[in-house]
Amino acid sequence: MPTIQQLIRKPRQPKVKRSKSMHLEQCPQKRGVCTRVYTTTPKKPNSAMRKVAKVRLTNGFEVISYIPGESHNLQEHSVVLIRGGRVKDLPGVRYHILRGVLDTQGVKDRKQRRSKYGAKRPK
């Protein structure tokens, strides 16, 4: 434990809070270009083929982001908008691609939670 004199000389430093989605640089979303679209498998208790894309952002960072919903139209050079939010069972995936924005189509025949998947209201 430091003495009062030591604290006067060198005060305590506040802990730096690190962002969980630092490549967004405090923005709610960022635009980027897909450099690779592929599937990967989740961690131990789960089993699936999760769709992910490697995206080069406008600020130069390259991040791995998750493509939510059933089926997608993304391929290399597609322009996408990403938001923060990790996928718990995919290590290294800390971002989500927004559906129904820019080159990404919304999910077809989606009835519930449509706004999250860029689906229009069914007639």
Curated annotation (Swiss-Prot):
Residue ranges with Basic residues bias: 9-21
Sequence segments annotated as region (Disordered): 1-28
One BP term from GO: translation
Pfam families: Ribosom_S12_S23
Top-level taxon of the source organism: Bacteria
GO terms for cellular component: small ribosomal subunit
Gene3D superfamilies: Nucleic acid-binding proteins
Modified residues annotated as 3-methylthioaspartic acid in this record: D89
Keywords: Methylation, Ribonucleoprotein, Ribosomal protein, RNA-binding, rRNA-binding, tRNA-binding
Cited SUPFAM superfamilies: Nucleic acid-binding proteins
A single GO molecular function term of this UniProt record: rRNA binding
UniProt key word Ribonucleoprotein: yes
NCBIfam families in alphabetical order: rpsL_bact
Recorded family membership: Belongs to the universal ribosomal protein uS12 family.
PANTHER family with a match to the protein in the record: 30S RIBOSOMAL PROTEIN S12 FAMILY MEMBER
Assembly description: Part of the 30S ribosomal subunit. Contacts proteins S8 and S17. May interact with IF1 in the 30S initiation complex.
HAMAP family, per the entry: Ribosomal_uS12_B
Function according to Swiss-Prot or TrEMBL: With S4 and S5 plays an important role in translational accuracy.
Protein name, UniProt field: Small ribosomal subunit protein uS12
The organism of origin for this protein: Ruegeria sp. (strain TM1040) (Silicibacter sp.)
Gene name as annotated: rpsL
